[in-house]
Amino acid sequence: MNKVHSEIKTQSFNPFWNAATLKEKSRIDPNLKKALSYLWKFLKICVFLFLTVIGLWGCTQTYSEPWTVSNPRIGVGLEIGYNYGVTGDYRYDLTSSNIGPYFSFANYQLSYGPFLAWFVWPASQIILPILYQTRVPLTQGIDYGLNTILAILILLFIIRLITIGITLNSTLNTERMGEVQGKIAEINAKYKNATDTQSKKMKQIEVMHIYKKHKIKPAALFVQGFVTIPIFLIVYKMVSLTRPIKATILFGIWDLSVTPGTEIISDISRNWVYIFFVLLVVPMQIVSQWLPQFWATRRNRNAKTTSQKGLEQLKKTRRIQWILIFVFALFPVITPSAVGLYWFLNSIFTILQSYITHVFIVKRRQRTKTISRLDQILNRELD
C-alpha cells in the first residue's frame, strides 16, 4: 500500500509523467552521450574560431587589399550590383564614373577574398532582386527608398530566423544570471578587498557553485556577441558596397551612402537634416538595449542584493552596462546612414523580440507556480 501511495505521489508531482517515464526507459548509453557532448563542444569551438577569423579578416581586409575599399560616391571603389546593361538603370548596373579607381562585383568570385565572397555577396543577392522589383522606375516619379527599407527588413527577418536558437539560449542564460545577480554581488562585495590566493580561490568556488546550481553557462553569455559582430560586419560591408543602396536618398532627404556625423560636422547649415536622422536612430538604439535590462529587473526583483557592499557592486556593474550602451549608440553616427537605417530597424526587431521573451518567461513562471501549488495540494490530500 505504501509503495502504491509513493508511486501516486511521484506521478502527481510530474505533469509530464508519461514522457518522463518513456525517457528513462530509452536512456542513451553514458559513454556515447559523453562522446557526443565532446564532439558538440569541439564543433562549437571550430565555429567560434571560424567566425573570429572571418570577423578579423573583414575588419582588416581593406588595409591590405585597397581594391575592396568602398566609396560613398556611385561608380567609385568596389561595388556590388548587376552587370552593365542588364537593367538599363544606372542605380543597379555597375559602371565607373571615371572619378577614381573602380571595381565591379556582379558575379560570384573569390578574388575579393572569402569574407566578401562567402558572406557579403550572398547577402547582397538576397536584397538585390527585392530592391530592383520594388523600385520606382526613373521615368515614373521620385524613389523615396521604401524598397530599401523593405529589403533590409526581409534580410533582418532571415538573420533573426538563422540566429534565433543562439539568441534564445543566450537570453535564457542572461535571465538565470539576472536571477542570481544579487548573490553574485554579495560574493564580489565579500571578497572586494581580498588579495591573497586562497580568498580569490574561495570566491571563484562560490561563484561557480551558484552557476552550477542554477544551470548557468557563463560562456553562453558571450556567444551572441561572437555571432553579432560578424553579422554587423557583413551588413556594414553589404550596405556600403551595394550600388542601389548607395544611390538611395531616403524620403528624398537622407543620402544612405554618407556618414551622418561627418555630414553634420562638415557643413551643418546644409546638412542639418541629418541631425533628425541621428535623433531618430540613436534613441531607438539606446531603448532597444535598455528595455531588455528593464524587463529583466522587473522579473527578478526578489533576486536583488540587500547589503551595502552588494548594492555598490551592483551600481558599478550597471554603470559599465550604460557606458557600453552609449558606446554602441554612437555607431550609427560614425557609419554610413544605411548602417544607421539597419540599426534602427534592428532595434525595432530587438524590442519586439525582447517583449515576446518577457511575456513568455512571466507566463512560464506563473504556470510553474500554479503546478507547484497543485502538487502541494495533491500531496497533502495523499498524505
Swiss-Prot record:
Keywords: Cell membrane, Chaperone, Membrane, Protein transport, Transmembrane, Transmembrane helix, Transport. Coiled coil: none annotated. Pfam families: 60KD_IMP (PF02096). It is found in: Cell membrane. This is Membrane protein insertase YidC. Interacts with the Sec translocase complex via SecD. Specifically interacts with transmembrane segments of nascent integral membrane proteins during membrane integration. One of its GO terms (cellular component) is plasma membrane.
